[in-house]
Amino acid sequence: MNFNINILGTGGTRPLHNRYLTSVLIEYHGESILFDCGEATQMSLRKQKISWQKIKMICITHLHADHITGLLGIVMLMAQSGDTRKEPLTIIGPIGIKKYLETNIELLRVHKNYQIIYKEIIINKTEPVLYEDKRKRIEYIKLKHSIDCIGYLFIEKDKPGKFDIQKAESLNIPKGPIRKKLQEGYEVMLNGRKIVPSEILGETKKGLKFAYITDTAYFEELSTYIQNFNLVIIESTFKDDLKEEAKKKLHLTAKLAAQITKKAKVYQTGLIHFSERYTLNKDLYELLNEAQQEYPNGNIFLAKDGMKLKANKDKFIIK
């Protein structure tokens, strides 16, 4: 299955020597989508030997420095790699993302030899579906933070079941375009008879659903957007002893993150966006323990810089 999730960074506020700022990249059928782009994101790409030229889209959650200061570097990197980039780069984010980037491009006289397409989200006005093709769609949800902040949902479409050649031959369906249309899930007319895909296809395979959620305070409706998702990467900035600080700063504790995914019956939960105060493994495992106590059957894990998750049937395997 051609679906990988790469953890480029897991920290909040500022990068540490062993923990870059929160950023996640999806590799899906030969193209990549980057979620957030803090300082040193391009270093993570280099370390993990991920091609920045395959990045088709960059989705920014909000305009705080730890989520956007690496964006200009990525744009410059793509421009300085010769004329190898042919496709435009789509950048999605809240109002202001275009002004932020274009101002920096102008001031630094960056020569970019490819097109940037901006899609600025007006929360509660922009349609939820941001992008869609035959394999997937990307949606946004409103989060609760000190400025406009967006969560992203990556939803793989259901796939038609296995093509039954014997049934196709028994129905005299010729090889070629007609079979292809049926395999893609479309009805066809053949000799005056309508043939539906279910006649020659096996059971439909459910697509995978992934969510990237940071930065946000707890709110009841959040779990409704991620019901039965296969994997949710969600911020877990603080331990429970700092729950009042989390509330004040509009962030989540690991325990609250687990409450959200438990309520949503999420299959796997990855904790991310850890406070810079947690420099020891002991601190991070205390975060993990608090989340696991809240949702014992939640398949909860700590996201780690350099981690790769590979899709395998209805779940993701940590490589």
Swiss-Prot record:
Reaction equations catalysed: Endonucleolytic cleavage of RNA, removing extra 3' nucleotides from tRNA precursor, generating 3' termini of tRNAs. A 3'-hydroxy group is left at the tRNA terminus and a 5'-phosphoryl group is left at the trailer molecule
Keywords associated with the record: Endonuclease, Hydrolase, Metal-binding, Nuclease, tRNA processing, Zinc
Cofactor detail note: Binds 2 Zn(2+) ions.
Gene3D superfamilies: Ribonuclease Z/Hydroxyacylglutathione hydrolase-like (3.60.15.10)
Binding site for Zn(2+) 2: D66, H67, D215, H273
Disulfide bonds: none
Gene Ontology MF, one: zinc ion binding
Active-site residue numbers: D66 (proton acceptor)
Essential cofactor(s): Zn(2+)
Assembly behavior: Homodimer.
Family: Belongs to the RNase Z family.
HAMAP family: RNase_Z_BN
Stated role: Zinc phosphodiesterase, which displays some tRNA 3'-processing endonuclease activity. Probably involved in tRNA maturation, by removing a 3'-trailer from precursor tRNA.
The protein's name in its UniProt record: Ribonuclease Z
Organism: Borrelia duttonii (strain Ly)
Phylogenetic placement of the source organism: Bacteria, Pseudomonadati, Spirochaetota, Spirochaetia, Spirochaetales
